[in-house]
Amino acid sequence: MPNNYKEMKVGQIQTLKVARISDFGLYLSDEEGQEVLLPNRFVSLTNAIGDEIEVFVYHDSEDRLVATTDRPLITEGRVASLKVVDKNIHGAFLDWGISGKDLFLPNRNQQGGVLAGRSYVVWLYVDNITGRCVATMKLKPFIDNDIITVKPRQKVDILIASESPIGYRAIINSRHWGMIYKNQIFRPVRVGDSLEGWVRRITDDNRID
């Protein structure tokens, strides 16, 4: 398989330049000269050769590398709470905000199975062999507190991952685990919520509150 997915940064939002126009849409080019199609349904009448367009690159339902101006709910190397919209014997399919294409969550990447209509916290990665975007519920390889990249009083992105008697376990900046104690919560929250917060303290053993 050609390595276009590596050059085009599959799974990420990026700015590409209009290289040429076809009957099917616009061909967008990156700095390496790699091209990807932006289908007509995402093309504006004002787009012209040389214009720069912010797009998300992925494989469509026919396994073609394409671009879209849709804004995904998750990108490569990030976590999000996504709803299961369908299932089959191979896995589940998640709504990730891309029209006409659901995000695949293979059975091997699930923990305890999933139910249609329920939302689950997942990480998005690009498969090294196929170049496709894939979801996983197994977060341990990606979320850790070995090397802390935040500091006290820093503003951070928070995803509520689970609830305990003392508070909520949260994922910070899609990188670290943290704890929000119930006496530090001043608004209703539930598992799957994304919000902004601040780091209160970091303990000697790298626990983040």
Show which residues each predicted segment covers:
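Single-stranded RNA-binding regions, centering on S1/OB-family and related RNA-binding modules
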Residues: 1-209
